[in-house]
A protein has these predicted regions:
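DNA-binding recognition helix and immediately preceding turn/loop
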Residues: 1-9, 13
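A solvent-exposed interaction/effector surface
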Residues: 10-222
């Protein structure tokens, strides 16, 4: 884990096993190789007097690599955390035991920081379904069997900071974004049928100062 940028084996464990079941029902919810432009830092007050902090940034297209599965909107809240647990049990035991990566998949997990992103992609042909990826920024090289690539188009993103223990911190911000910020926003419309959860590999997901974020693609209103 240390070789691939994680400060300790424990930090990798936390990054890989964190809670990821926050995909909202019936809403659309990277660092490497991304070029950022014109960051706009904003803090707005919403109902109840609380504030939500976000940045608006443009990025070039970038590619993620990870494990993908099809989910139903109605059952995703339960099934996505189970998906993370399943992938952890199958692919991470050697790494977490301090033995280092031994298979192509294990090397890909470490080299591409799998677990940094949760990616929701609403392009499934079946109604009521969407693709979800446990992913990381693709660094190039062979794609092992069982893993897939997805290229996120160049976009303008509204990135909402979440600070606090999971899942409550992200769920709270997520609710505010979709129920209050987006419907009442006078500057941006939703763009694209994909969105991203970002999770820090450092810190304790149960801590009050743990950092994560919600990214949604936006376009200026005409």
């Amino acid at each position: 884990a240390l070789e691939y940028g994680y400060e300790t084996p424990e930090s990798f464990t936390k990054a890989f096993t964190r809670f990821h079941g926050t995909t909202p029902i019936e809403v659309r919810r990277d660092r490497s190789k991304m070029q950022l432009f014109l960051p706009l830092h904003v803090s707005i007050k919403i109902q109840g007097g609380s504030k939500i902090n976000y940045t608006v940034e443009k990025t070039e297209a970038f590619t993620v690599i990870g494990f993908e599965r099809l989910f139903s909107f109605e059952t995703s809240y339960k099934e996505i955390p189970d998906f993370w647990t399943e992938m952890y049990k199958i692919h991470a035991p050697n790494i977490l035991a301090g033995k280092g990566p031994k298979t192509e998949v294990e090397h890909a997990i470490m080299e591409n920081y799998i677990g940094e992103f949760g990616v929701c992609i609403e392009d499934a042909p079946a109604p009521g379904k969407f693709r979800y990826m446990i992913a990381g920024p693709y660094q190039g090289g062979k794609v092992p069997q069982g893993m897939k690539l997805y290229t996120v188009p160049a976009n303008m993103w509204a990135k909402f900071a979440c600070v606090g223990a999971l899942p409550n911190a992200m769920q709270s911000v997520n609710t505010k974004v979709w129920s209050e910020w987006l419907p009442g926003n006078k500057e941006y419309d939703l763009a694209g049928k994909y969105n991203i959860e970002w999770y820090s590999a450092d810190g304790d997901p149960d801590s009050t100062d743990y950092e994560s974020a919600i990214w949604i693609p936006v376009i200026p209103k005409k």
